[in-house]
Amino acid sequence: MEASRNRSLVGNNRSPEMNENDGEDVAASAAVEDVEVWDTLSNGFKRAQLYLDQNRDLIQRVNENHMSRIPDNVSRNVGLINEINGNISQVMEIYSDLSLNFAKKFDQRRRTTKDGDTTTTTTGS
């Protein structure tokens, strides 16, 4: 322990060098960040897919109502189409949030790499 302390004190007068473990720490930190980014993307796409699947079912119902030519069924299409539009808005919001979060992470990673900073920060969704 004393030898490493002496080496450390001597090393303070030199320019900072990367410890052999620093590369591993940076790689581990980047891997954790990558997992977080992929999890965020995956969860967002799953949420969007739920709305898209619901829209597929709603569109099928609208088509069936239209084909039936029964006035009550056709009049129900107004509500169904409004629901479809609401779902499309939700999907757009999810994709917009994903895009923004991904761009922030990418920019953060770029700045971190450029500055040589190995610290990471997380952003809330």
UniProtKB/Swiss-Prot annotation:
UniProt-recorded Gene Ontology molecular function terms: protein homodimerization activity
Compartments it resides in: Nucleus
GO cellular component: nucleus
Domain of life: Eukaryota
Keywords for the protein's UniProt record, in alphabetical order: Biological rhythms, Nucleus
The keyword Nucleus appears for this protein: yes
Signal peptide: none
Residue ranges, compositional bias (Polar residues): 1-18
GO BP annotations listed: positive regulation of circadian rhythm; rhythmic process
Positions of the UniProt region annotated as Disordered: 1-28
Keyword Cell membrane set for record: no
Family to which the UniProt record says this protein belongs: Belongs to the EARLY FLOWERING 4 family.
Its biological purpose: Component of the central CCA1/LHY-TOC1 feedback loop in the circadian clock that promotes clock accuracy and is required for sustained rhythms in the absence of daily light/dark cycles.
Summary of subunit composition and partner proteins: Homodimer.
Protein name, entry field: Protein ELF4-LIKE 1
Gene: EFL1
